C-alpha cells in the first residue's frame, strides 16, 4: 500500500503464478506443434489457413494467390551424419497402422511444410519430392523459408 491505495492489482500475475517458470518448450513435442507453426507461418505471410474437418491426406488448406493449396506438415528430430532426415511417406489406412509406407500422391498434396530439429522451416513443392518416402533435408536448402528457433527461448530443451 502506498498513500493508502491498494496496488496489488497492478502486480504481474504471470510472475506470481506458481509453476509457470518450469514450463519449457521441448523438441519431443515438435510433432504436436508443427501444424500450429505452419498455420502461424502462413498467417504471418498474409494467407488464410484452414484445417480439414474430416481426416484428409493433407493437414492444412492455404489460400494462396494462385488458389487453394493442400499442405502436408512433417517434422524430424532425426539427425544422422549426413544431416536431418525426414519421412515424407505415409502409411495406408489399415488396422494397427502396420502397412509399409508409400509416397504421397502429388495430385493430392501441393506442398510439404517441414520443420527440422533446429526448427528450420522448409516449404517444398510436392512434385519435387514425388515418389520418395524419406529425404535428406540438406539437399533441399533452397526451399528454406524461415526458422522458428525463437520459440525455444534461446535454448533447445532436449527430451
Which residues does each PLM region occupy?
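Non-catalytic C-terminal interaction segments of nucleic acid-processing enzymes
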Residues: 119, 124-159
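Loop/turn residues immediately N-terminal
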Residues: 56-58, 119-120
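Catalytic cores of nucleic-acid endonucleases
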Residues: 74-121
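Nuclease-adjacent, charged terminal/linker segments that flank catalytic cores
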Residues: 1-4
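Short alpha-helical elements
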Residues: 18-20, 24, 67-71, 105, ...
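Conserved catalytic cores of phosphodiester-cleaving nucleases, focusing on short active-site segments
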Residues: 42, 60-62, 67-75
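Acidic-basic catalytic patches of nuclease active cores, encompassing PD-(D/E)XK
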Residues: 7-51
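Active-site metal-binding core of divalent-cation-utilizing nuclease and nuclease-like domains
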Residues: 48-56, 63-65
Amino acid at each position: 500500500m502506498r498513500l493508502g491505495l491498494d496496488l496489488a492489482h497492478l502486480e504481474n500475475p504471470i510472475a506470481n503464478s506458481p509453476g509457470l517458470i518450469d514450463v519449457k518448450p521441448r523438441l519431443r513435442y515438435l510433432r504436436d506443434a508443427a501444424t500450429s507453426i505452419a498455420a502461424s507461418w502462413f498467417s504471418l505471410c498474409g494467407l488464410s489457413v484452414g484445417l480439414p474437418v474430416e481426416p484428409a491426406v493433407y493437414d492444412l488448406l492455404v489460400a494462396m494467390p494462385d488458389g487453394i493449396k493442400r499442405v502436408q506438415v512433417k517434422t524430424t528430430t532425426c539427425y544422422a551424419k549426413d544431416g536431418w532426415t525426414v519421412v515424407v511417406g505415409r502409411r495406408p489406412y489399415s488396422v494397427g497402422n502396420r502397412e509399409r509406407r508409400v509416397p504421397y500422391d502429388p495430385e493430392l498434396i501441393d506442398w510439404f511444410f517441414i520443420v527440422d530439429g533446429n526448427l528450420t522451416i522448409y516449404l517444398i513443392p510436392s512434385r519435387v519430392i514425388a515418389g520418395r518416402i524419406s529425404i535428406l533435408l540438406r539437399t533441399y536448402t533452397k526451399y528454406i523459408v524461415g526458422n522458428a528457433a525463437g520459440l525455444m527461448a534461446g535454448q533447445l530443451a532436449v527430451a
